[in-house]
Structures are given as structure tokens and as C-alpha cells.
Amino acid sequence: MTVKERIAALRAHMKETGIDAYLIPTDDFHGSEYVGEYFKCRKYITGFTGSAGTALIMQDMAGLWTDGRYFIQAANQLEGTGITLFKMGEPEVPTIHEFLKKNLTQGMCLGFDGRTVSAKEAEELEKMLDENGVSLSVDHDLAGDIWENRPVLSCEPVTELDIKWAGESRADKCARIRKAMEKKGADLFVLTSLDDIAWLLNIRGGDIHCCPVVLSYLVMTKTEIRLFANEKAFQTDVLEALEKDGVILFPYDSIYEYVKTFKKDKKVLLCKKKVNSRLVSNIPADTRILDEENLTLLPKAAKNPVEVENERIAHIRDGAAVTKFIYWLKKNVGRIPITELSAAEKLYEFRSEQEDFIDNSFDPIIAYGKHAAIVHYFATPETDIPLEPSGFLLADTGGHYKEGTTDITRTIVMGPATEEEKKYFTAVLRGTLNLGAARFLHGCTGVNLDILARQPLWEMGEDFKHGTGHGVGYLLNVHEGPNSFRWKIIPGGNAVLEEGMITSDEPGYYREDGFGIRHENLMVCKKAEKTEYGQFMCFEFLTMVPFDLDGVVPELMSVRERNLLNDYHAQVYEKISPYLNEEEKEWLKDATRAI
């Protein structure tokens, strides 16, 4: 079926079930950023393939809301479908809540699959629409009902993460969380975020593409841990090891019945922003719910010393692979046929040669020329274009290693660049360097520091429409909270930067139909000196790959900025050159020369 035919089928199904408006978010049952094939209902109905967005279908309209990363991509993919693009955050563009409030009236019904909407979101919708006399219907997966040949739920093998990689045993982690439960006065802790469960139990899987997680739910009490997952994914030795630490396996879907048995005198701690609305609605009404952040959130984000040291190793190996790739590109562009897709395959080949490499940490963004202006462009056979010895190639890629997860962006100068292109290339690089060199008092958040990355562009009256940085998991999700860099203050989204947190530093500049630039390093937060003013903090770059000096205008940089770049490049050469052959080493020596 075409997109128009799918929407028509969905509208007919809505009429049958008495639903006037149907909401289709991106989420799976666990609030994951990226989802398995089974959960891609929004993509199936709309044809939009971006990782963020919400569709709304009514009898007389169809709309898609997405953020600035995907404006260009969404406009292209929605063309001719009859779906209206709502550009989130733009002037005069209503939020999806504002649109629903205005367009749903007395007696109408809003529907969605309650397993794909958080309890907090559902409560907000119910409160807002109740004022209009609008009801909610949350027990129907209407989009799934009409999905022909829908993929099955993933069930990839589960493995244990050895303590030499994790740095802390499962038993010790569970003891820590139980102490936190005790402090909160909680009798039960409901955990449904897949990366949190994987971190807590020191297990990894493959149920989401590029995300080594296991489809599961978890309930912890003072005496037992119930893990709800598909038993077929677990080998006997893994099950026995889990049972030894008090973890008992139950069928994946059985949690929805289990939570109905919670007693009224018990206090249940869960995060309504993370747990889906159907699960929470199944908890007896007289049970007291403590709505708080997951107790695993901060311990997971603040990597322990073993994890940090392992990450340094992973980034050196990854740096060697990406450096080899850049050398190969520079040497061969214009001499042999190379396209965006074949370049991505070549980079995967270089990574695969590295010890302990597992997989990409996300689908690679290899964007040439004007494609780089699309912030999260993914090449397809239909969009793939050849690389030429001119302009910029933006390569935003990453890998999973046993030692951790990487995420790096380099803008590679493929041939002669204009003075204007170099001006913006240098401005973005200055932002990356200045943020990476920040020294700040403990208690600062990413909001306090974000201006360091944007200032060079703001001075030019320019900006970029994405966050400056995100947290990164340890052999887990490449996007991890709560740490981030952004200038907008978001309630509940401004975590203090703690020792061990790994965060990306990735300002950019994008000119539609022109070019795109992004420079990204991962960095770990560390303690610096302590004085009478308090504990000072700093960052250490983990990423070890040269920035392309062919795009840099030294005269546009301060002496301090040039020194920062030179010092970084000296580190890159020292750590990466031992992994290169003589030709590559000679090239790297020039690529990291002092300016």
C-alpha cells in the first residue's frame, strides 16, 4: 500500500472503533529513542524515516510534528502524501498539544496505543482534553492492526558483560539501587528503560538496531528482582548467573498482569516520563506511586574508573579506523569511484579490523555537499551520490567496542574550499575547542557552558538547530541522559555535570542546498583543582582523530585556540600513529602539524 492508502485504511479502522483522532508516536513500549522494526508504526503510516516525530491522523487532516534536525528530510519524504509538516519550535507553528486542544471538541475521542505513550504524557493529554469534553481510548494499536506483514518482536541472544568491562558487579549495582530505594521509602522499583535494565544487570543484547539492549521490563523489591523478557533469548549459563544474583525470568508481556497484584500499602517508585501509560494504569489505584527519575540514571551516566579507562582504549582503536578512512578518502577521491554508501562501507571495513569491534553505534551519516546541510541525513540507494574532489564531506559515525561506545563527526575537505566555507569551518571548530577546554565549578550544567560552543557563530549572527552535546552510554545507547549541552532551559533536563560523565561536543553550521559542517569529539568530565571556591571540573577529549587543517583559517583563531588545536593534534599523532602503516603515518604527521 502507498502512504495515502495506509492512511485511508487507518481512517476506516478509526471509524469502526469510534476514534476521531489517532496519535502515532515514534516510541516502543519502553520509550526508546531508536526502536526495533516491530515498533515502526509511524514510519509505516507516514513514510517519514527520521528517528523523532509524532503523527496525528484525523478524518480531514494528517500531520507530522518533528524537530529542526529533520525539517528538510521530512519535507522531502512527506511530499505528495497529503501529510502536513509541523516544524516544532518555529514561530506560529502549534505544538501537537495546542493543535489537539483547538481541534478536538465535545464528544470526540483521541486514541493511541497506551504502551507507546508515557504515563506523564497521557496524564497531560487527559487533563488538557477533559476540559474540552474529549475522551481517550488507549487500548488499541490501530496502526499495527492494518500493518500487513508486520515484523515480529526481536529476540536476539543475551550475553553477560564481564566485570572487566563493566567495572562493577551486578550484585553490587543491585545493592546500590536497593539502598537508594530504602532512602526513598520505596518497596518496589519499576524499571522499563532498556539501557537502564542492561546497565543494572550487566547484560547486553541486540533487540534494537545498533543498540545492544534486551526487550525487557524489571521490577525490584527488597528481596527479589523480576525480569520480564523472552526466555528464548537467554542461554542456560546466563539464566543461571542471573538466578544466582536473585534475578528471576518471567514472560515479557506478563508484567501487565503482575503489576495489578501490587498491594495498597506498598510504595512503588517509577518514572512516569519513562514508564508507559498502560503499565501505570494497570497498577491498583490505591497503591502509592513515587514518581521520580530512575534510580539507575545517574549511576549509569557517571562512568566508573574502569569504564573510563576502557573508553580511552576504545577511542584510540576507533581513532585509528577513522584516521585510516580519512587518509583513504583523501588519497582516492577523484581517482576511483566512491559514493556516500560505498564510503560508509569502507569505514565499517576499517572499524571491523580493530580489536574488540562489535558493530556501528548508529547508522552512519555520510553526507556529501548539499546533503550535509540535512542534519541527520542517511544515504539510500535513491539519494546516494558520488564523491568528487571538491567541497565538504560530513561523516558522523560511531562504533561499539567491548571497551565502550564511540561517536565522532569530522567534516572532510575533499578539494578546494571557498573562503566562506573555510570561515564557517573555522568558526565551528573554534566552538568545539573552546567548549572542550572549559574549566568550571562543580554544579554547572550543560546550559551554563553551551555558549562556549555557539559564541563564534553567534558573533556572526548564525546558529545551529540542534543540541551541542548529548551523553553517551557505555556499550549502550549512543544518546544517553541526563547530561547534555544546550542553551534552552528545559524543565528536568538540566543535569549537573558529574565526574565520569561522557558527553559529545558537536557544534555545527548548515546552509540549505549548500553545505554542512559539524565537528564532534566525545569528552569525559573530570575533577580539576579544589580551592576555597569549591571543586573545579574540566573535560578530557576521548576522541582521537585529526580535524582537517585544509578547512582551517589560522588567522581567524586566537593564539589560545591555535594552541588548543596544536596540543590536541600532538596527542592524536602520539596515540594513533602506532596503529598506522608508514604512508598513513607520514600523512598523519602533516595532518597534525602545528599551525
Name these PLM-found stretches.
Residues 1-595:
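Active-site neighborhoods and metal-handling regions in enzymes and metal-associated proteins
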